[in-house]
Every structure is written in structure tokens, then in C-alpha cells.
Amino acid sequence: MVARRLVAAELEDDPERSYAQAHVARELAARVGVVREVTGLAAYRAGKWTEALSELRAARRLTGRESFLPVMADAERALGRLDRALDLVHSPEVGKLTRAAQIELLIVESGIRRDQGRSQAAVVVLQVPELTDGKVRPWSGALFYAYADALLAAGREDEARDWFERAAAADPEGETDAADRVHELGGMVLEDLADFGDDDAGE
């Protein structure tokens, strides 16, 4: 019964229905770490920030895993608790995360800096080696998109358009709306990152 609810929650496209399935599983097995994890992630996708934090804190205690940090930090940001979000972003446990999760945290931090009105800091925090090393990773599209968004918020529209183009090329499945953003800014969507030059990110 619990497993079926968890699978249903994972497969459900509608955030509210996913949350409802996960919540039933949580009522049946509240002391199981994976149940609290799935419930927390479902709550996050449904915009239930406080509950997401509560469930993911429990999952963290029960499993000993730190992989929830990016989602927890983003939930704190959504609640307007920027200092708490930054505490998570800079916690010692970040060193235990995969590089993909660390990049997720940097993307959250960039958003926090924008919320603080520090648009240039939002750009700088994303200037990591993976931004310009020419390699495409599963999370490159998200990184390029966040960088483009930060550039746009900083008033650097031409650079932002270039990076939205890169994001669209690195995101063939269309998981972001990078292609739409390119069109909004009057750019052209290219199909391959090889079509771009080797220019480094702006300072």
C-alpha cells in the first residue's frame, strides 16, 4: 500500500495529486525516511514550503543524507527567510554533495542575491568553471538558464540572450522555457552548443 502510493506520487504530473498520494503514504509510514523524502518533495512541487521543510528535515534525520539541501534552501527562500536559506547554502555539509547538487545550490544562491537586490553578485556566484569549459552535462541547461536570468536582471540583455541560446541548445528536451526566452529577446535558437564560440562568461 505504501509503496503503491509512493510510486503514484512519483508518476503523478499534477503537483496537488502527487502531494495527496504522498501524504497518504506518510500517514501510513511516518518513520520511513524515503516516505518523508517523497512527501517533502511533493509538498515542494505543490508550493507548500513550510511542510516541505518539515518533511525534508525529517528525511534528513532518518536517512542521514544531505541531498535535500538545495530544495530546503529554495523553500526557505520562497518563505522570504533569506538568511536561513544562505545558512543552508553555506553549510559544511555542502562538501558532501554531488557536483550537480552543488550547482543547484549555487542557482538557489543566485536567486537569493537577486532577492537581496544584489544583481551583480547573482551573476558572479554562477561563474564556475563548468560554465565555460565547453562540456555539456545533464544540468548544464539549468546552469546556463540561471546565468542568463541573472544577466538579464543585471541589465545585461545582449549577454543574457546569448546564454539563453546556450541554455536552449543544452536543453533539447525543453525542460526550461529557454527557447521562449530567446524569442522574447529577439535571438535565434541554435541546435548545438558547437555553434557558439569559446567566449568566456563576462566578469
PLM regions and their residue ranges:
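Extended, charged alpha-helical interaction scaffolds
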Residues: D83-G155
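Solenoid-like repeat scaffolds
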Residues: H23-R31, R57-G64, S91-R99, V128-V136, ...
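Structural register within alpha-helical repeat arrays
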Residues: R5-A8, T39, M72, E109, ...
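TPR alpha-solenoid repeat register
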Residues: V35, F68-L69, L143, D177-A178
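Residues that mark the junctions of alpha-helical repeat units in TPR/alpha-solenoid scaffolds
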Residues: M1-V2, V32, R65, Q102, ...
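Structural motif corresponding to the intra-repeat A-B loop/turn of tetratricopeptide repeats
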Residues: E12-D13, A46, L79, Q116, ...
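Alpha-helical segment of the N-proximal tetratricopeptide repeat
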Residues: M1-A20, V24-E27, R31-V34, V38-Y44
